[in-house]
């Protein structure tokens, strides 16, 4: 074989071992001893990981590239002088997309993808705005961005109706057209509180999704019993439509409320167990995002049930939240401090669980084939300046190398392509 690359002295958490990794023709040819790697290749470039962490890249399972950097461009963040107000932010979002040209949207998305790749992110699911006024303008801009960065990054595009799929027939037409243009999934948002018709909204999600044979990823922000009822009904519709394993509920704040109620002796039954039963039966996946995850989100219980959970950055310096540096370790650090008061997620097992959300959990949620460091898988590799996932999070470790399909695309936190 003609050799491409050897990564020597790579620590793989999945094996808890330091190995050499041989890469040829964009795929992993050998993992193991120096002799095995040398035998697989002939005259490769060598990278010495020095015993540090190597993994197959972060997965940003929930992000909005479409409004990325909308808070940037001035000395201090724009749209950031008042406390958070959802209604005001929705109005600003509408105004932003109506007034921003497609070229700017594409350029901002590409800039954020390049920033993400430099931080070791190689995969994402991007929720992308549609409504009855802008139609598919934003979708088309993000699809163009996807094409521009395709050599660096894999991204799924979700057609996301911020004001609901029932906000007029034009929205449903925009959703259908978006899927025909190349969007990968249908999005949705709180069926009860946004469009005031829970059942009809969910039915419409599945009607449009099944027409185009695409998966669903819906924002479910509603808390309390309304939120858990929404999740249960989504799960029931998934089973009814044969969509087991094809639906994601993003945010799902109500699960944290259900966990609190389940610990209250005044509450009858087991509210958390009931909704988790429904999600498990329908194989509904979940995403959570560090800017908004409520304390008490029961990600440990989700893991015990085998429910797939990914993590997303959600915002990237945008008009909703000015945070977001496209750096998943930043999100994991925040989560390690806020998820519970006992600092469970600051322990070594807790940090390992958070790391899994950023990597294999997200890969499972997105259905990424060949994700991992095994012979025959695509040579997507990230080398971090940390000896373990735990120290990568706690120390906010630098990214030393990012390798995409066997090609080095970033070194020392900067793109080289």
Segments (PLM) and residue ranges:
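Metal-coordinating catalytic core of metallo-dependent amide/deamination hydrolases
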Residues: 98-99, 128-260
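Alpha-helical scaffold segments that flank or form the walls of functional sites
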Residues: 72-127, 133-148, 174-180
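Divalent metal-coordination and catalytic microenvironments
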Residues: 10, 26, 51, 62, ...
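N-terminal metal-binding scaffold of metallo-dependent hydrolase/deaminase domains
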Residues: 1-41, 389
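Active-site gating loops and adjacent loop-to-helix segments of metal-dependent hydrolytic enzymes
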Residues: 69-105, 230-269, 275-278, 282-286, ...
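C-terminal cap of metal-dependent C-N hydrolases
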Residues: 364, 375-417
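His/Asp/Glu-enriched, well-ordered alpha-helical/loop segment
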Residues: 215, 236-247, 299-384
């Amino acid at each position: 074989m003609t050799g491409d690359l050897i990564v020597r002295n790579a620590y793989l958490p999945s094996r808890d071992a330091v190995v050499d990794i041989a890469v040829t023709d964009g795929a992993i040819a050998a993992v193991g001893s120096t002799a095995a790697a040398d035998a697989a290749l002939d005259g490769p470039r060598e990278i010495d990981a020095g015993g540090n962490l190597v993994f197959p890249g972060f997965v940003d399972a929930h992000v909005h590239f479409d409004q990325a950097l909308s808070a940037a461009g001035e000395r201090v963040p724009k749209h950031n002088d008042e406390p958070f107000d959802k209604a005001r932010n929705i109005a600003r979002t509408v105004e932003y997309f109506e007034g921003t040209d497609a070229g700017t949207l594409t350029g901002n998305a590409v800039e954020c993808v390049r920033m993400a790749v430099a931080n070791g992110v190689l995969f994402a699911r991007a929720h992308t705005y549609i409504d009855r006024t802008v139609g598919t303008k934003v979708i088309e801009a993000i699809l163009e961005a996807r094409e521009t960065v395709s050599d660096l990054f894999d991204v799924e595009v979700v057609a996301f109706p911020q004001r609901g799929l029932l906000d007029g027939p034009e929205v449903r037409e925009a959703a259908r057209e978006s899927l025909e243009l190349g969007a990968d999934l249908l999005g949705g948002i709180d069926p009860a509180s946004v469009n005031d018709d829970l059942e009809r909204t969910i039915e419409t999600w599945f009607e449009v999704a099944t027409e185009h044979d695409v998966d669903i990823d819906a924002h479910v922000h509603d808390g309390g019993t309304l939120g858990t009822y929404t999740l249960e009904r989504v799960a029931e519709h998934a089973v009814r439509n044969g969509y087991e394993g094809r639906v994601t509920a993003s945010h799902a704040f109500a699960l944290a409320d259900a966990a609190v109620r389940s610990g209250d002796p005044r509450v009858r039954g087991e509210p958390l167990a009931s909704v988790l039963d429904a999600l498990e039966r329908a194989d509904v996946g979940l995403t959570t995002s560090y800017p908004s995850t409520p304390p008490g989100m029961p990600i440990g219980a989700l893991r015990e049930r085998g429910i797939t959970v990914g993590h997303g950055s959600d915002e990237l310096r945008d008009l909703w939240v000015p945070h977001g540096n496209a750096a998943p370790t930043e999100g994991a650090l925040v989560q390690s401090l806020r998820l519970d008061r006992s600092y469970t997620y600051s322990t070594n097992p807790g940090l390992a669980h958070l790391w899994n959300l950023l990597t294999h959990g997200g890969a499972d949620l997105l259905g990424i084939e060949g994700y991992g460091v095994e012979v025959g898988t695509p040579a997507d590799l990230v080398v971090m300046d940390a000896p373990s996932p735990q120290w990568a999070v706690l120390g906010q470790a630098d990214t030393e190398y990012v390798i995409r399909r066997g090609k080095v695309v970033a070194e020392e936190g900067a793109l080289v392509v």
